[in-house]
């Protein structure tokens, strides 16, 4: 199993950030490996909603079916599966005075054969985690509008 965690502060209110990130199709905007991510069911986003995510990792194309397993006002969990892996994206949110603190944890569990490569892949997943921590705040800003100026930023 590989686990990567990043903590980010986003310059938008918690409810807006959760609303944006609850639609897993938006991973196209912030996950560096995602090529496409399409909703496979319809209706409002709620527990049980599903997305087909196609991504490229180390030159290999892979497809996972993700399901929204938890949808709380301050906690989202998406679980993606295919024949060789289970991927869990766990997003916890905390109000930070009108801003949002996001604790993002990605966990990948490989099947038998792929499990042997886990130690070799850890560094690559850490690199992807770094990219997510750069891209996700920009995607949120783009989707929700430019972040408002704070006291420590020039106007």
Task: Give the location of each predicted region.
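Hydrophobic-ligand binding "helix-grip"
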Residues: 43, 54-103, 107-110, 142
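Hydrophobic pocket/interface hotspot
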Residues: 17-21, 27, 51, 68, ...
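Secondary-structure transition/hinge residues
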Residues: 25, 29, 59, 137-144
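Short coil-to-beta transition motif at edge beta-strands of beta-rich domains
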Residues: 45-51
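Hydrophobic ligand-binding cavity/cleft-lining segments
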Residues: 1-40, 46, 154-155
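A conserved amphipathic terminal alpha-helix motif
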Residues: 107-155
